[in-house]
Amino acid sequence: MNDYINGFLYKIDDKFLYLELNYLGYRYLYLKSDLKNFKLNENNKVYIAINVIDNHFKYYGFFNQLVRDLFEILININTIGEKTAFLILENYSYQELIDIFKNGKTDKILQLKGIGNYTARLIINSVQKELFNNKISEKKNKVITSLEKLGYKTKDIYKIIINVDEDLTIDELTKYVLEKLSYINN
C-alpha cells in the first residue's frame, strides 16, 4: 500500500489533484481545506488513502498524514462514506476533531448538515475506540439512550459515563450518571 507520493503537481480542478511522477500521471480526490497548502507547478508530498467500493478504487490525497489517518478511520465506520468523512474534516481542524472525539462532543458533530444523533454517536464511539481505546459497552449504551430520551444532552452524558466503572449494574450506572448530571445542570 502507498503511504505518500512526492510528485509534480501540474493541475488542480474542483475535485482532483493531478500529479506526475516518473512519467506517470496520478489523480486524487482532495479536501478543499488542503488546497491552500498545495503548490501548483511544484513537487508536493501527498499522503494517499484508498477506498474500494464495489470493486471500484477511489484515491484520496491529503496534505497531512494525521488527517489522512483520521479519514481512513471515518470511512471504515458503517454508514459513513466519503462525503460524510469529508464534511467532518472540512469543518474542523485536526486538533479540534481530536478534542471533539476525546471529550465526546456529539453536539459539534450534530451541527454538521445531514448528521443525526445516531450517526454522531456512532462516529464518536468508533473514533474513540480506534484512537483512545475507549469502548462504550452495551450497558452504557442503554443508559445513554435512556437518559437522552429523558432530555439530557448526549455530550454531558458521555463526559460522565466514559470513565465510570463497568462493574456497576444498569440501575447503579443510571443513578450515578443522573447524580452527576444534576451538578452539571445546576
UniProtKB/Swiss-Prot annotation:
Keywords, comma-separated and alphabetical: Cytoplasm, DNA damage, DNA recombination, DNA repair, DNA-binding
Subcellular location per the Swiss-Prot or TrEMBL entry: Cytoplasm
Record Gene3D superfamilies: 5' to 3' exonuclease, C-terminal subdomain
Main localization of the protein described in the UniProt heading: cytoplasm
Entry's transmembrane regions: none
GO annotation terms (biological process): DNA recombination; DNA repair
Domain of life from the UniProt record: Bacteria
Region (Flexible linker) residue spans: 137
Comment text on domains: Has three domains with a flexible linker between the domains II and III and assumes an 'L' shape. Domain III is highly mobile and contacts RuvB.
Function: The RuvA-RuvB-RuvC complex processes Holliday junction (HJ) DNA during genetic recombination and DNA repair, while the RuvA-RuvB complex plays an important role in the rescue of blocked DNA replication forks via replication fork reversal (RFR). RuvA specifically binds to HJ cruciform DNA, conferring on it an open structure. The RuvB hexamer acts as an ATP-dependent pump, pulling dsDNA into and through the RuvAB complex. HJ branch migration allows RuvC to scan DNA until it finds its consensus sequence, where it cleaves and resolves the cruciform DNA.
Record text on subunit structure and interactions: Homotetramer. Forms an RuvA(8)-RuvB(12)-Holliday junction (HJ) complex. HJ DNA is sandwiched between 2 RuvA tetramers; dsDNA enters through RuvA and exits via RuvB. An RuvB hexamer assembles on each DNA strand where it exits the tetramer. Each RuvB hexamer is contacted by two RuvA subunits (via domain III) on 2 adjacent RuvB subunits; this complex drives branch migration. In the full resolvosome a probable DNA-RuvA(4)-RuvB(12)-RuvC(2) complex forms which resolves the HJ.
The protein's name in its UniProt record: Holliday junction branch migration complex subunit RuvA
Species classification: Bacteria, Bacillati, Mycoplasmatota, Mollicutes, Mycoplasmataceae
Gene giving rise to this polypeptide: ruvA
